Amino acid sequence: MIETDRIISANTAQTNDENVIDKAIRPKTLAEYEGQPAVREQMEIFIQAAKARKDALDHTLIFGPPGLGKTTLSNIIANEMGVELKQTSGPVLEKAGDLAALLTNLEENDVLFIDEIHRLSPVVEEILYPAMEDYQLDIMIGEGPAARSIKIDLPPFTLVGATTRAGLLTSPLRDRFGIIQRLEFYSIDDLSKIVYRSAKLLNLDITTDGAMEIAKRSRGTPRIANRLLRRVRDYAQVKGSGVICFEIVDKALSMLKVDPVGFDHMDHRYLLTLMEKFAGGPVGLDTMSAALSEEKGTIEDVIEPYLIQQGYIMRTARGRIATLLAYNHFKLKIPDNLSADQQQTLSI
């Protein structure tokens, strides 16, 4: 089982049709942007101030889990500033010349968006430093003894960097961003508003409780919410009257094996293995990998993060431990003979 099989994974690659739909329903202004109230308020002030001064917005770093709207926010920044957005990603910029070509084509105050900025090569990153600080491009012409450095002046611009792994950014790069924003998982209320708005833009008939139920199963992530909405739309069209209500959502997502808290078959299999085969743990990663027939990297990077974040498991020095939430979720009896680690965990 791999992550691309999971409908509730924010990392799952989207089809061309899904990308077209996502662009159509993506908010274009801060007024349309639901959730992230602190980020929205701060960016509104920073953008208004920059526009009043006729300056480029400070370089902005946006980080957080996948699917929370980093690309959407970069588009909104460009729209609100009334400038063009040029998009690229860290892995694409292999050589200094790749970045130089982008930078020299920017107009005044334009926004350059680099997704996965933590994956920039060191050579490209070095070129970026003077561009961010002094709006200058420092490049070498020629080779050997005849090589010389030339400086190219750049128009003022805004670099917006996005990453899911801010800890992998080098300090020199991170320190050059004047604005740093962290996107948090969305509340169910905010997600239900996003689902309702998307449904209306797609001309779908949806009830309030239908939108709320999709939101509850979306793991706090708009990308997942919009994907589930599209799948429920298909179910409502074929098996119902076309109206997306609570009953239709429940039947559609049950068919897709997405439970009321957003867990799928991989989450269920992991938790039940931990509780039923290993009495709740502690269990080492190697043992879980063998029991599930999954790669260790898949378990650590795909399955466990959401379970840990929601408090269903804990990682300890001795291994993985199921929490009281996990036992309650599956209505399982807590074993009588628990380890000291488990007793402490379940009493929290």
UniProtKB/Swiss-Prot annotation:
Protein localization: Cytoplasm
Classification via InterPro entries: AAA+_ATPase, AAA_lid_4, DNA_helicase_Holl-junc_RuvB, P-loop_NTPase, RuvB-like_N, RuvB_C, WH-like_DNA-bd_sf, WH_DNA-bd_sf
Molecular function GO terms recorded: ATP binding; ATP hydrolysis activity; four-way junction DNA binding; four-way junction helicase activity
Pfam families to which the protein is assigned, alphabetical: AAA_lid_4, RuvB_C, RuvB_N
Binding site for DNA: R315, R320
Residues engaged in binding ATP: I25, R26, G67, K70, T71, T72, E133, D134, Y135, R176, Y186, R223
Keywords for the protein's UniProt record, in alphabetical order: ATP-binding, Cytoplasm, DNA damage, DNA recombination, DNA repair, DNA-binding, Hydrolase, Nucleotide-binding
Identification of the protein by name: Holliday junction branch migration complex subunit RuvB
